Amino acid sequence: MNNFLISLALQESSTEVQGGLFDFNATLPLMALQFLALTIILNLIYYKPLGKILDERDEYIANSLTAASAALSKANDLTKRYEQDLAESRKKAQDIIKNAQQDAQNIVSSKIKEAQKDADQLMSNTYDQLNIQKEQALQNLEKQVDILSNQIQIKLLGN
């Protein structure tokens, strides 16, 4: 039986045509068609949706970057505006404080001048009243001196 199998194998090998690297039979175009079909199927099922997802992702990233840069620009503009408003408000507040200090200083100066004037007038009035009282006291003393002088003279001369 072994001999039969060996002889069959030898017969089989002698009937086959020995080819080179490729055998050009019906399997080669079939493999090419299978490759093209697989490429088309993969393109439709996998690559197009994947490409679409990647494109949408790129578009989303670009839109997000655009929106973020617009928001950053707006935030920078608002920051500059608020800083300018703050600087202007500080300047106005400093001007108001300066004017209030000047007004207060003027009021204090005028009150001091008025108080000094009132004090000078009060001293002048007091000095005048004291002079009047002094004159009256001197006149009273002169009268009393005259009366006492007359009484002393009468007592001395009359005795």
Swiss-Prot record:
GO-annotated cellular components: chloroplast thylakoid membrane; proton-transporting ATP synthase complex
Parts of the chain that traverse the membrane: 30-47
Subcellular location: Plastid, Chloroplast thylakoid membrane
Alphabetical list of Gene3D superfamilies matching this protein: 6.10.250.1580
Function summary: F(1)F(0) ATP synthase produces ATP from ADP in the presence of a proton or sodium gradient. F-type ATPases consist of two structural domains, F(1) containing the extramembraneous catalytic core and F(0) containing the membrane proton channel, linked together by a central stalk and a peripheral stalk. During catalysis, ATP synthesis in the catalytic domain of F(1) is coupled via a rotary mechanism of the central stalk subunits to proton translocation.
Note: In plastids the F-type ATPase is also known as CF(1)CF(0).
Similarity-based family: Belongs to the ATPase B chain family.
NCBIfam families: ATP_synt_b, PRK07353.1
Protein name (database record): ATP synthase subunit b', chloroplastic
Organism: Antithamnion sp. (Red alga)
